[in-house]
């Protein structure tokens, strides 16, 4: 439910989070493919790095949400399924969230850092939960959002607007 942002935890927002999370846990807890619950995507890492945080209360609110509120809800509604506070994480509390020897890591230097594919051979992560390289959608998909065949060019205005990574096209 949470990714790539920091939130001010007002009482109303906390109540909303609790209600929405309870609804989702009840809806999903019996699915055979559920391996674990994860509190958020990339937020522990970016808060630890000082990105996105504008005031100390946001760090406190982060800890309260992902290391207290959500675990309490899961203890009540799905105590059998493992909870991991963030991805990447080394287990929470901002304890080196990208440690390659504990928890999980996200490694995007090949894509975002323009390193060669062989760079993956330099690392032996305990668990790389995110990595990769972007590719184009299928031509059939491209035709669904382009009206003019000239827009099929990867440098066309339409294709550039569909690209969200600064190092792409």
Which residues are covered by each model-predicted region?
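Active-site neighborhood of glycoside hydrolase catalytic domains
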Residues: 6-98
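Acidic, His- and aromatic-enriched active-site or binding-groove loops in soluble protein domains
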Residues: 2-6, 101-120
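Generic alpha-helical propensity signal that fires on short helical segments
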Residues: 46, 52-55, 101, 144-151, ...
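Substrate-binding clefts and catalytic carboxylate motifs of secreted carbohydrate-active enzymes
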Residues: 37, 72-75, 84-87, 91-94, ...
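Acidic active-site catalytic centers that drive phospho-/nucleotidyl reactions
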Residues: 1, 42, 130
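Alpha-helical structural elements
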Residues: 32, 78, 103-106, 147
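Glycine-rich, flexible loop/turn motifs
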Residues: 24, 104, 138
């Amino acid at each position: 439910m949470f990714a790539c942002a920091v939130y001010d935890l007002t009482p109303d927002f906390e109540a909303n989070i609790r209600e929405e999370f309870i609804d989702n846990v009840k809806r999903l807890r019996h699915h055979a493919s559920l391996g674990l619950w994860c509190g958020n995507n990339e937020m522990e890492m970016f808060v630890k790095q000082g990105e996105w945080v504008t005031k100390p209360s946001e760090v406190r609110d982060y800890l309260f949400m992902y290391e207290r509120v959500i675990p309490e809800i899961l203890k009540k509604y799905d105590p059998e399924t493992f909870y991991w506070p963030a991805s990447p994480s080394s287990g929470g509390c901002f304890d080196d969230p990208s440690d390659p020897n504990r928890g999980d890591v996200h490694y995007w230097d090949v894509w975002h850092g323009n390193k060669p594919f062989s760079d993956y051979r330099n690392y032996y992560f305990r668990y790389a939960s995110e990595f990769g390289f972007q590719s184009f959608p299928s031509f059939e998909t491209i035709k669904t959002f382009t009206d003019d065949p000239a827009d099929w060019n990867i440098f066309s205005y339409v294709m550039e607007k569909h690209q969200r990574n600064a190092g792409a096209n």
